[in-house]
Amino acid sequence: MAAQGEPQVQFKLVLVGDGGTGKTTFVKRHLTGEFEKKYVATLGVEVHPLVFHTNRGPIKFNVWDTAGQEKFGGLRDGYYIQAQCAIIMFDVTSRVTYKNVPNWHRDLVRVCENIPIVLCGNKVDIKDRKVKAKSIVFHRKKNLQYYDISAKSNYNFEKPFLWLARKLIGDPNFEFVAMPALAPPEVVMDPALAAQYEQDLQHAQATALPDEDDDL
């Protein structure tokens, strides 16, 4: 039984990607999750309970954050076991972090098989973007969802969670009725830049995939 006021619906979400892509910054934006996080010493993981209020009551994503161990090689299977969904993050200002996305995806599906996954390109607030919409094709090949995000400005913060919730619950009309309390923006996402990026993504989505069958 869930405690009084505790969301009945809970999901384990694993957050993966290269070190320095902004995973911890992203998960810390959700203030109650940051306040209530727990450290799992055996795995060296912080679990942030992120609650969202929806048209079907509150739901909770228990977000597993690696606390930087990915810098020392792969993650242990214990991190992935029983994950119900995942976010793979890369940094749009660093091409190598996008090049490594297939490795993270491979590790995930090896343990978790067929779970819903969102790919997020973080740091889109930075003007010097290296990984452009047209070169982000991995999600289309593997049937993942993709979002541009900017953790420091809260831009698109809720989008990955809403998409995952709709998939997990099986209801396309599922909505968040209120935004969670987020840390104040540290940078401002330029609305014109955001609009341009959204247009670029739509255009890229409508473009045929390149023929070569490598994983990038």
UniProtKB/Swiss-Prot annotation:
NCBIfam families: small_GTP
Entry annotated with the keyword DNA-binding: no
Primary location recorded for the protein, binned into one broad class: nucleus
Alphabetical list of Pfam families matching this protein: Ras
Role, per record: GTPase involved in nucleocytoplasmic transport, participating both to the import and the export from the nucleus of proteins and RNAs. Switches between a cytoplasmic GDP- and a nuclear GTP-bound state by nucleotide exchange and GTP hydrolysis. Nuclear import receptors such as importin beta bind their substrates only in the absence of GTP-bound RAN and release them upon direct interaction with GTP-bound RAN, while export receptors behave in the opposite way.
InterPro entries, sorted: P-loop_NTPase, Ran_GTPase, Small_GTP-bd, Small_GTPase
GO biological process: GTP metabolic process; mitotic sister chromatid segregation; protein import into nucleus; snRNA import into nucleus
Annotated Small GTPase Ran-type domain residues: 7-171
Compartment(s): Nucleus; Nucleus envelope; Cytoplasm, Cytosol; Cytoplasm
Transmembrane annotation, as ranges: none
Name of encoding gene: ran
Protein residues bound to GTP: 18-25, 36-42, 68, 122-125, 150-152
CDD domains: Ran
Residues the record marks as site: Essential for GTP hydrolysis: Q69
Subunit structure: Monomer. Interacts with rangap1, which promotes ran-mediated GTP hydrolysis. Interacts with kpnb1. Interaction with kpnb1 inhibits rangap1-mediated stimulation of GTPase activity. Interacts with rcc1 which promotes the exchange of ran-bound GDP by GTP. Interaction with kpnb1 inhibits rcc1-mediated exchange of ran-bound GDP by GTP. Interacts (GTP-bound form) with tnpo1; the interaction is direct. Interacts (GTP-bound form) with tnpo3; the interaction is direct. Interacts with kpnb1 and with tnpo1; both inhibit ran GTPase activity.
Protein name: GTP-binding nuclear protein Ran
SUPFAM superfamilies according to UniProt: P-loop containing nucleoside triphosphate hydrolases
Reaction it catalyzes: GTP + H2O = GDP + phosphate + H(+)
Family to which the UniProt record says this protein belongs: Belongs to the small GTPase superfamily. Ran family.
Cofactor binding remark: Mg(2+) interacts primarily with the phosphate groups of the bound guanine nucleotide.
GO cellular component, one term: cytosol
Enzyme Commission designation: 3.6.5.-
Cleavable signal peptide: none
Organism: Xenopus tropicalis (Western clawed frog)
Switch-I: annotated span: 37-45
Start and end residues of each stretch annotated as Interaction with RANBP1: 211-216
Needed co-factor(s): Mg(2+)
Ranges for region Switch-II: 68-84
